[in-house]
């Protein structure tokens, strides 16, 4: 087994599990350590397998969820915070995600204290922040934006 890479070990384990054609399959981080093409192959394999069976996916890789799941559950410290469809989860965070761009470092720090930040970038225009919270920022230059699955996860787990 020392001859196999982490990705190869993952593939071998998945094939072993699929050989028995279980009615219920649990996969934990099945695409971690795989190159992008292999990730897609594994996702497609699991989607095909799930057509007639139940596959429980445990992962932190948002792309895996978006490509494979029609039902989601979000857990924190052993408690379910959300169960339902991806669309319903995205709707929970709708109206609670904004993007602000500022050249003012102190304003950026203040926004970071007041909101959950899902993204921070230094651009030619200034500091671009993606904020999540209950109320729209009063600072100028903040606009509502489309919700990503990552935004929805952060919103639900930090309420």
What is the meaning of each model-derived region?
Residues 19, 78, 138-140:
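Short, charged low-complexity intrinsically disordered segments located at boundaries
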Residues 1-76:
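ABC transporter nucleotide-binding domains
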Residues 115-159:
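C-terminal coupling/interaction segments
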Residues 33, 80, 140-143:
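Short N-terminal micro-motifs specific to bacterial/archaeal maturation
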């Amino acid at each position: 087994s020392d001859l196999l890479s982490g990705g190869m070990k993952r593939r071998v384990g998945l094939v072993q599990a699929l050989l028995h054609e279980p009615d219920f399959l649990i996969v934990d981080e099945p695409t971690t350590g795989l190159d992008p093409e292999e990730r897609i192959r594994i996702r497609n394999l699991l989607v095909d397998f799930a057509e007639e069976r139940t596959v429980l996916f445990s992962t932190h890789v948002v792309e895996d969820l978006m490509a494979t799941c029609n039902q989601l559950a979000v857990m924190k410290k052993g408690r379910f915070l959300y169960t339902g469809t991806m669309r319903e989860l995205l709707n929970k965070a709708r109206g609670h995600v904004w993007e602000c761009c500022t050249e003012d470092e102190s304003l950026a720090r203040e926004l970071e204290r007041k909101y959950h930040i899902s993204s921070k970038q230094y651009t030619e225009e200034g500091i671009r922040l993606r904020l999540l919270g209950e109320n729209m920022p009063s600072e100028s230059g903040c606009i509502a934006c489309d919700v990503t699955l990552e935004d929805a996860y952060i919103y639900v787990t930090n309420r």
